[in-house]
């Protein structure tokens, strides 16, 4: 039996007139543009060499309580199973690639090590195969419109799979009983008059459609409960732009924000999270003084060209002072030469800027049905403790474009001539050295005659 929990947020001020029909077999809502989350708990075959796996496809953003803010695109995290005999690397990657091959085009050596986890990120990716896989897992019972760029999260914890979908609801929101599913539907709105940022009050209805319960007499229940959000929205804003500077561009960010002051907060610090594709890197020795701490995972070899690196790139988390403007120096790696253009245009995600705040009564965060924190994945969340809440500043940018200079294919001829001259020079130097030795050391026979 598959467990399905559907949460539907009513954007109006009242639930009156929202439900058009309800009984023990179905629920029909009026046609309103709802935001919706489906959570499925599935029993699937266990992996032999994978301990935990989290796939996050982030395409849809909203400030609704249903949504957590992560870096846009595809984020995949995987922990290998380590037994008494250690870690079987070959078998682990065979099992991981067997699953990934049917969903995403990820090279075996494209992952980076991040803390104790393998991590892969791609800002934009073809998601059709993954969405089709999700349709099959859920038996097409989702109430989220999968045609309108949904967020999808697949989590394998070693025992079961938890699948979360959120985004816009289907145009015709009618949920029916299914003998293979235990369904719980919540229709909620926020009681704004008695809610605050750190204490949100939800009121509404719960509908139970148990597939194996013929009577199902208590299918409709009124409900009201409090939610303490981990992911919160700051009133602050920021904007980023790239200042071209040849192979060493600057990522400039203007920040307009005040430190949060909700009642449950203890202390707050401002953070800057950035992922960079393998065309760029940050040199920790050239960080401006505004960045007071620094964590970087990925290939940190500063000399390798882009085409010699297999990993997707790197992720960076930094604490920053409350400056109004910061400028992060980036370094471009040498690109593969091309005769058609002397510039390669590539994109990076806009950084995420947020306050990380220690909070009182942190146990209330974990009791929220919408808390998305796990011990694997979640971009920046992994670097913070369980008692941290996040206040996200708003930005209108998603992708930033950067021009990288590159040579043309005549560089091969130049390299050949350069190497030839270098070899000739080395040969000449050795020739002169040997010649000098023979001049200083005449033969023994010559010395005897003298």
UniProtKB/Swiss-Prot annotation:
Membrane topology of this protein: Single-pass type III membrane protein
InterPro entries, A to Z: Pbn1, PIG-X/PBN1
GO MF annotation list: mannosyltransferase activity
Main location: endoplasmic reticulum
GO CC field: endoplasmic reticulum membrane; glycosylphosphatidylinositol-mannosyltransferase I complex
Record topology, Lumenal segments: 1-413
Subcellular location: Endoplasmic reticulum membrane
Membrane-crossing residue ranges in chain numbering: 414-434
Protein name listed in UniProt: Protein PBN1
């Amino acid at each position: 039996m598959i467990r399905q929990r559907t949460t539907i947020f009513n954007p109006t001020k009242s639930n009156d007139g929202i439900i058009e029909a309800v009984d023990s077999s179905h629920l029909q809502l009026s046609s309103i543009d709802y935001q919706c989350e489906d959570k499925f708990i599935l029993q699937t075959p266990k992996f032999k060499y994978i301990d935990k796996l989290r796939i996050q496809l982030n395409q849809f953003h909203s400030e609704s309580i249903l949504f957590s803010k992560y870096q846009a695109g595809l984020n995949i995290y995987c922990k290998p199973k380590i037994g008494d005999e250690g870690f079987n690397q070959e078998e682990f990657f065979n099992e991981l690639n067997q699953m990934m091959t049917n969903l995403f085009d990820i090279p075996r050596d494209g992952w980076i090590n991040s803390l104790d986890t393998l991590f892969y990120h791609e800002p934009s990716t073809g998601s059709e195969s993954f969405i089709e896989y999700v349709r099959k897992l859920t038996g097409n019972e989702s109430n989220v419109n999968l045609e309108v760029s949904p967020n999808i999260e697949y989590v394998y914890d070693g025992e079961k799979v938890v699948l979360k979908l959120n985004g816009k609801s289907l145009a015709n929101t009618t949920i029916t009983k299914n003998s293979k599913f235990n369904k719980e539907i919540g229709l909620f709105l926020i009681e704004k008059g008695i809610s605050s940022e750190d204490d949100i009050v939800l009121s509404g209805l719960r509908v139970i459609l148990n597939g194996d319960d013929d009577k199902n007499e208590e299918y409709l229940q009124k409900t009201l409960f409090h939610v303490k959000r981990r992911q919160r929205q700051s009133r602050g804003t920021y904007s980023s732009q790239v200042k071209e500077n040849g192979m060493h561009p600057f990522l400039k960010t203007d920040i307009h924000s005040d430190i949060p002051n909700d009642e449950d907060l203890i202390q707050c610090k401002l953070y800057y999270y950035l992922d960079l594709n393998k065309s760029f890197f940050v040199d920790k020795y050239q960080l401006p003084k505004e960045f007071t701490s620094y964590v970087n995972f990925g290939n940190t070899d500063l000399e390798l060209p882009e085409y010699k690196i297999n990993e997707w790139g790197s992720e960076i988390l930094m604490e920053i002072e409350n400056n109004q403007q910061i400028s992060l120096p980036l370094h471009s790696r040498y690109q593969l030469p091309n005769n058609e253009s002397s510039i390669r245009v590539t994109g990076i995600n806009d950084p995420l800027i947020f306050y990380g705040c220690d909070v009182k009564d942190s146990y209330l965060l974990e009791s929220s049905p919408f808390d998305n924190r796990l011990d694997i994945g979640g971009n920046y969340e992994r670097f913070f403790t369980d008692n941290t809440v996040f206040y996200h500043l708003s930005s209108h940018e998603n992708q930033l474009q950067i021009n990288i200079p590159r040579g043309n294919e005549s560089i091969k001829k130049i390299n050949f001539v350069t190497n030839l001259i270098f070899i000739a020079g080395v040969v000449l130097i050795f020739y002169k050295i040997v010649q000098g030795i023979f001049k200083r050391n005449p033969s023994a026979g010559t010395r005897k005659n003298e």
